[in-house]
Amino acid sequence: HMSAYDADNGDLLWRWYTSPTAQDPMHSTWGDEPQIYPLQRRRNMSPWMTPAVDSERGLFIFGVGSSAPQQPQLAGTNGEWPDRLYQGSTVALDHRTGALVWWAQHHSDMWNDDSVYDRILVDAKLNPSAPNSLGQNPDIDPDQTRELVIGSFSKDAIFYAYDRTDGSFLYARPTAYQNVIRSYDGATGAYTTEPDAIMTAEEGKEATICRENRQIPQGAYSPLTNAYYVPAFNGPCSVMSMRSTEPTIETGYNTTYSATVPSPAAQLGQPEAIDVTTGKTLW
């Protein structure tokens, strides 16, 4: 959960749960009632990196890490958007009350992709035309200066731009090689997962997942160049399978890594500068 305390006396001011309670309408994304994984059985979903703060709008904007169980089938869902919120999502809370303002889900995290990395607040015009686009909003006005939240939010290092006033999806494009996301619906931001990357609830069934493309070192934005800089790399791909049907209390995970294989990318290190307006690679 995310909590706020009074700095003078330590009193709890508010608390917001990163996995929806029964009073949250998004509770239904964890399957039909009676749920296989009600709130008290769910694991992980930690916002374990630093949030962005929009002081003008009074927003905390942050990412939520992977859930457990990791396989949607175990929770009684099919992994389609929106799935088992708020894992794999960017969330904006009113910092005064803890009320949810908006959310945007980037994937159903079956792979410990951890969507917790940099959210950078930028005001810029958009006219996306990246040749490797995974999706873009068809209603973008190229003459409008948008209030954005940008970054490569997860280990897969996909670059995103969202409207930070309401969480609207604007565009997404890959950086380093990944094989987990096929595309995004430009109007809704709904993801489509690559079929071969879907982790099933079948013990021992393996999937080769390529998404180890960034870690804790943060990306950066320069207003001088209007560029986002991502410290990406083409890390090894993981051969993953379900270890058990029950996440462990110690780690929260129920997936095992049986081997690693080289990424099909031509090089390991791949730092990149991306023009925020167009989504094109600068270098």
State the predicted function of each range.
Residues T50-S55, F60, V64, Q87:
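Active-site cores of enzymes that catalyze phosphoryl transfer or operate on phosphate-rich substrates
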Residues F62, G151-S152, V230:
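Residue position within the beta-strands of beta-propeller blades
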Residues L59, L148-V149, A227:
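Conserved core beta-strand positions within WD40 beta-propeller blades
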Residues E56-R57, S154-K155, L224-T225:
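Short strand-connecting beta-turns/loops that link adjacent beta-strands
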Residues A52, D196, A201-K205, R211-N234:
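Long, low-complexity segments enriched in small/aliphatic residues
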